[in-house]
Amino acid sequence: MLDIKLFRNDPEFLKEKVAKRGMDSKVVDEVLELDEQRRQLISQAEEMKAERNKVSGEIAQKKRNKEDADDAIAAMRNLGDEIKVLDDTLNQVDVDLNDKLSRIPNIIHDDVPEGATDEDNIEVKRWGTPRTFEFEDKAHWDLVEELEMVDFERAAKVSGARFVFLTGDGAQLERALMNYMITKHTTQHGYTEMMVPQLVNADSMYGTGQLPKFEEDLFKVEKEGLYTIPTAEVPLTNYYRNEIIAPDVLPAKFTAQSACYRSEAGSAGRDTRGLIRLHQFDKVEMVRIEKPEDSWQALEDMTHHAEAILEELGLPYRRVILCTGDIGFGSSKTYDLEVWLPSYNDYKEISSCSNITDFQARRSNIRFKRDKNAKPELAHTLNGSGLAVGRTFAAIVENYQNEDGSVTIPEVLVPFMGGKTVIRPTK
């Protein structure tokens, strides 16, 4: 959520930023109108409450003097009724203002390129050379079924479309990837491992920006009023919600493996085969809570941490800066890492690393003190995939396939696979 002071102090700047996001800039005027209405109502209510207190004192004085106080009592009742109407109106204006503010995206960084779609993203780095096969290579969705690593058909029977059973070597490879990624982030990159709740309340979803704008993308447990998490970013970021963080805690660096649940609303017909777009998938997440002056370097560091995984796995990738039309709602700047997938003859997103600045911290009331006597300040929050496990799985199967239908295990994963170096067809 943006600071209301920005709207009051520099509305033209905000209109420019909002317009670059593809929103109608009149939303800034609508916020200012509600804000002015709110301030007028507060002023009127305070004046009436002061008058009520004055009349109350007069009533007490009249009673002490044994004078008739009926007119004053009637006046106080009328004031009370008027104050209630004002308070009710003020409460509704507060709701309307907060709802309006909660649907306005973060201010984009000056580095973010203007554009409408992912085709306008700017490539800033490329690592590795896509493999040239000397045989007819196969897509991962064919390879994993031939190797009996997955079962889509039975998953559809049990749960529906866009679910999968990982079986045998497939389950082992998925687990090996998660263990490897978590170990790398905790032992070499300085993150604290967390095991997170996978059901969270509406306040948590609001804090990280999924609610109210993106509710259709979520799965909800109606009876309990809880949501399945779309990413471990949600519980990790909310860990310090409504808290003032002690001076010696920052930077806070968390990593967690979790299942992620997404309805994929609006993605019908996209990536319908294989492991690229599922309703449930595993992901290793990185979350950082930083002092404002440190957050931009933290974004670079976190992106390098995700890249280190891809490089150790030997997977060609590129880094792009997301444009104004593709960047996420809460992000000020986002790098996407895209891994090479031969079946697409293209790069596909495998990680997003974003600086959310104080956007989530304001919604979640995450503050810190520079010393014990200092005034609390809003922290900056960042998040990044390190990595999406299913997409890494698919990339390994495609890039490490052999002519006989087997898949070589990347060297760095062999210890996590119990020493296994190749996954071979069982038939």
From Swiss-Prot:
The keyword Ligase is assigned to this record: yes
Main subcellular localisation: cytoplasm
GO cellular component assignments: cytoplasm
UniProt-listed Enzyme Commission number(s): 6.1.1.11
Pathway, per record: Aminoacyl-tRNA biosynthesis; selenocysteinyl-tRNA(Sec) biosynthesis; L-seryl-tRNA(Sec) from L-serine and tRNA(Sec): step 1/1
Residues binding L-serine: T231, A232, E233, E285, S385
Complex and partners: Homodimer. The tRNA molecule binds across the dimer.
Identification of the protein by name: Serine--tRNA ligase
Species per Swiss-Prot/TrEMBL record: Staphylococcus saprophyticus subsp. saprophyticus (strain ATCC 15305 / DSM 20229 / NCIMB 8711 / NCTC 7292 / S-41)
Organism phylogeny: Bacteria, Bacillati, Bacillota, Bacilli, Bacillales
Name of the gene: serS
